Structures are given as structure tokens and as C-alpha cells.
Amino acid sequence: MDDNLQLADGGFTKNVARSGRRARQSAEMMSAEDSRQRRSSSSISTAAEGPPPKPTRRQGGWAEESSTTTNVRSGRRAAAEEPEDRRLRPQTPEGSDNESGEDIPVIPDLEEVQEEDLTMQIAAPPSVQVNRVMTYRDLDNDLMKFSAFQTLDGEIDLKLLTKVLAPEQEVREEDVGWDWDHLEVSSELQSEWDEGDREDQSPLPVCV
């Protein structure tokens, strides 16, 4: 029949074109079948090509993270220990020969060290200069012998004072021993004398 469709090279072709309502219905049916055929052909082609490649899995977890963190920490520790190791290493001055034995300290033997006997040593007393204080006797002798002391600051004449100065024998008083009885009697006498002085100083009555 003329209405049959022929498949050629994966497509549909019409032998005869019709007009009218039946022709429109047949055209719609042909377009629907054409779309179905295309879908089926596309699915067949994709199946022939093979399944798409699977996405690569991301391998990781706590084990990998711990390994990376340990590597980072070990690197930091090594970087921090480097300057400390440099400080602890013995540093030799530049230009010195390490092979020579001059840099090696020599420890003396105990026999060579002389033991000092501190028991027989006596410390020297400190030498302190003390200014001697002049006594009254020295001052009196100076006043009597030297006329330079008869003036004060070169302006005040002290001759009148030196003339009336009494000798030491006349001024000195003998030491008298006191006990509690003497002290009580002296305090009573002193109180009586004070009362008598007050009575004498009291004003006399005025007669009107």
C-alpha cells in the first residue's frame, strides 16, 4: 500500500503526500511514530557505546588526616629544634684549629693545690682615725696660756669672762651618796619651802 512507510537510513520517508482531514491525522501519527523511533534509536546508540565512566572515589578519612597532621607536626618540631640544637652545640671561635689541644681545659691535680690554713691567720684590726675630744681642763689651760682664745671671731672680747673664771678646785663639788630616807626628807623640805614662798608672795590685805 501507498500509506506504508519505508525505513531508509534510520529515517522515515513518505511516498505520496495526501491532503484533507485524513491526511492531517496520518501526518500527526507519522510525527509521533517518528519521535518514538528517534528515542529508541538514541537509546540503542547509547547502549552500544557503553555505560558512562564512574566518578573517582575520594579516598580519605581519619587515618589520612592523622598522617598529614603528624607530618605537619613533625615538620614544626624539627624546625623548632634546629635553633635549639645550634645553641647547644659547642661553638669554637673562627680561625681556631680544633685539632690542637689549646682549647681543652686542664684540670689540676689535688696534690698541686695548696691547702690554706685559715686557723693561723688573724685579721688585722681596722684603722679608724678618731678625733680626740678636748676636756674642760684642756680648754681652761688653752684659755690661760693662749691669748688668741680671749677673742671670739676677732670681734668679741672675752677678757672680762676669763678674769672671773674660778679655778676647778673651787667649783668642783664632792659626790654625796643619797638613799631613800634622804630623798624623802629632801622632798618634804622642798614642799615646805614652796608653801612658804607662796605665803610670802601672797598680796597683803588693803585697809579701807
From Swiss-Prot:
The keyword Cytoplasm applies. As a component of IFT complex A (IFT-A), a complex required for retrograde ciliary transport and entry into cilia of G protein-coupled receptors (GPCRs), it is involved in ciliogenesis. Involved in retrograde ciliary transport along microtubules from the ciliary tip to the base. It comes from Danio rerio. PANTHER family: INTRAFLAGELLAR TRANSPORT PROTEIN 43 HOMOLOG. The gene is ift43. This is Intraflagellar transport protein 43 homolog. It is found in: Cytoplasm, Cytoskeleton; Cell projection, Cilium. Belongs to the IFT43 family. Residues 78-88 have a biased composition (Basic and acidic residues).
